[in-house]
Regions:
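RNA pseudouridine synthases
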Residues: 1-234
Length: 234
């Protein structure tokens, strides 16, 4: 009923994907793969699809009900604190940004709500746990309790630990504009450290749609993240 793959970055997920597309090939020629969730363009990792409409309904119900545990590994700039960080609040637009699709995280603990006129406000919850910390970088595990656009990236940026290689929420959002116009300089690429954002969907845990057995889907870190991690943490 369901199939999954370890998606490479920049392989776009589209509702109209067919067996002739890269994703159709990944899933063994499924004629109309029904994607149960999405990843940002530069995020790698586990992607789950349904073979049938019935399986798609069951899968989407699991995501909506919170029965799915979404686990990410992420390299961030800065020394992330030890222990567990619970980040709850709201995700809203950022109209003053040069990047139209940029989002802003408003932490619940600060008591600051998004502007009343913003019609695209969503509550969000993410838990972060430090895995390793060395020099200017930290390796963090993130568990997304909600599935908001750019949730992990915007939250980490608001906390002061932007994702390595993130052109929108990283060291300078104008990097994204230069990236779009193919004008990134050598200094820009050095500041980014990686040509992609270092965010990886490492695993999903969810009940099987028929048996109810807990499924544990895992995807290893891609080579470029492993190489950067090892250069600092080995």
């Amino acid at each position: 009923m369901w199939r999954w793959t370890n998606r490479a970055t920049c392989l776009v997920i589209r509702a109209a994907a067919t067996s002739a597309t890269p994703f159709g090939i990944c899933f063994g020629g499924i004629e109309k793969p029904r994607f149960l969730h999405r990843l940002d363009r530069e995020t790698s990792g586990v992607v789950l699809v349904a073979r049938t409409a019935e399986a798609a309904r069951a899968g989407r119900e699991a995501f909506v009900s919170g029965a799915v545990r979404k686990i990410y590994q992420v390299l961030v700039e800065g020394g992330f604190p030890s222990g567990t960080v619970h980040a709850a609040g709201w995700m809203a637009g950022e109209p003053d940004s040069l990047v139209r699709k940029r989002r802003r995280f408003f932490p619940e603990k600060d008591g600051i709500r998004p502007p009343a006129g913003d019609g695209d406000v969503r509550c969000c919850r993410t838990t972060f746990r430090l895995q390793a910390r060395r020099g200017p970088l930290s390796l963090v595990v993130a568990v997304s309790k909600t599935g908001r656009l750019h949730q992990i990236r915007a939250t980490l940026s608001a906390l002061g630990f932007p994702v390595v290689g993130d052109k929108i929420y990283g060291v300078d959002e104008t990097l994204f504009l230069r990236f779009l116009s193919d004008e990134l300089t050598a200094a820009d690429r050095s500041a980014l450290r990686l040509p992609r954002q270092a965010l990886h969907a490492a695993g999903l845990r969810l009940p099987h749609p028929v048996t109810g057995t807990l499924l544990r889907l895992r995807a290893p870190l891609p080579a470029e993240m492993v190489e950067l991690r090892n250069s600092f943490f080995s």
